Design a protein with these regions (language model features):
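Glycosyltransferase donor-sugar binding loop
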Residues: 197-210, 226
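Nucleotide-activated donor-binding/catalytic signature segment of Leloir-type glycosyltransferases, i.e.
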Residues: 210-231
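Acidic donor-binding loop of glycosyltransferase active sites
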Residues: 235-252
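Short hydrophobic beta-strand element within catalytic cores of glycosyltransferases
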Residues: 243-244, 261-272
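Conserved donor-binding/catalytic core segment of Leloir-type glycosyltransferases
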Residues: 161-178, 184-188, 198-201
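A charged, aromatic-enriched C-terminal amphipathic alpha-helix characteristic of glycosyltransferases
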Residues: 290-327
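Acidic anion/phosphate-binding donor-loop and adjacent secondary structure
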Residues: 105, 135, 146-166, 179, ...
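Donor nucleotide-sugar binding/catalytic pocket of nucleotide-sugar-dependent glycosyltransferases
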Residues: 118-136, 140-157
Length: 327
């Protein structure tokens, strides 16, 4: 079956470090039931119009299109591409990652998502909440919605340091939606965290946010604003007792960082939303920051190993193909 995957991926041009779309495409390329079409113009949305031989279009991150460079034009190309594909009899699968745009507070992302819901022949999501959200937000849509767990990036299990250096690690790109600043301010006044060592590491491209975090830092939080290599990141997670996620649950449904963290077999604490709630055997979920120090560090080894075994990237195209009868 011929499939086109948006956004297109060109390893020579894509420097974003987007592991998800790279693995997604490679999984379909490796499965003999699929033929991936991937003509890559400079405007990724124009790619839909250049790959109309595809029988199936799988579309990711529709909510981000309006905020791209020349967003209005990109949105136009995207709409034209979807309509042209449907006129040719292709089926449209929307992979719903977020409830809405994380950073674009205009109405444009929501309008495009509304339109996408009316055109999709099927919706896939990496969280049970995603299916509930889709049915509640788009009740007029007749498209079936299915939950497929987020695949893991590797089957390798990373060893832990003999003596942990950090009690908690917060890692990944730092932006306002991840509520790192809010957590730092909370922690500074929380006696239950005062005897903990907390590492925050990741690149923060927002200079104003970076400055605010530095002003708010208590002595027991170490802040490292830097882009870390895979090896550097793995070393820091391995040297930590627990992985902590402070995300704003308003828009998030699933998290690649959460899935990446599973291979360390560490206790994880995160907000009670989306895939964090789905993985309740692994993730200790909180409703507000005040609950974080009260949550026990549970043994997640068996549950994490089970998830890793059941959710490889190689299995993902097979799971999609099993739903073909509903398209």
């Amino acid at each position: 079956m011929k499939v086109f995957i948006y956004p297109t991926y060109d390893p020579k041009r894509d420097k974003s470090g987007n592991l998800y779309i790279d693995h997604f495409r490679k999984a379909f390329e490796a499965d003999r039931n699929w033929e991936v079409l991937n003509r890559c113009p400079r405007s990724e949305t124009l790619g839909l119009l250049l790959n109309l031989r595809a029988e199936l279009f799988i579309l990711h991150w529709v909510d981000l299109i309006p905020s791209k460079p020349l967003g209005r034009l990109q949105t136009l190309f995207f709409r034209l591409g979807v309509m042209a594909a449907k006129r040719r009899g292709a089926r449209i699968v929307w992979l719903l990652h977020n409830k809405g745009a994380h950073d674009d507070r205009s109405s444009r992302p929501a309008r495009l998502m509304d339109w996408m819901a009316s055109k999709a022949d099927m919706v896939l999501t990496h969280s049970e909440e995603g299916c509930r959200f889709f049915r509640q937000r788009y009740p007029s849509s007749t498209a079936p919605c299915h939950y497929i767990p987020h695949p893991v990036y590797t089957s390798e299990i990373y060893p832990s340091a003999a003596v942990p250096e950090w009690d908690y690690i917060i890692w990944g790109g730092i932006s306002r939606r991840k509520r790192v600043l809010e957590f730092v301010r909370f922690a500074a006044g929380c006696e239950a965290l005062a005897d903990k060592k907390i590492l925050i590491c990741g690149a923060c491209r927002d200079s104003a946010l970076d400055a605010e975090i530095r002003v708010a830092l208590p002595p027991f939080i170490y802040y490292e604003n830097a882009f870390l290599s895979d090896g550097e990141l793995a070393a820091r997670i391995s040297a930590s007792r627990c992985v902590l996620f402070t995300y704003d649950g308003g828009t998030v449904l699933s998290s690649g960082a959460l899935i990446y963290s599973l291979n360390f077999l560490k206790p994880i604490k995160g907000p009670a939303v989306g895939s964090f709630s789905d993985l309740s055997e692994i993730v200790s979920c909180y409703s507000d920051f005040g609950e974080i120090p009260l949550l026990p560090l549970k043994d997640v080894r068996a549950a994490a190993l089970s998830y890793i075994a059941d959710n490889s990237w190689a299995d993902f195209p097979v799971k999609v193909l099993s739903l073909r009868a509903e398209l």
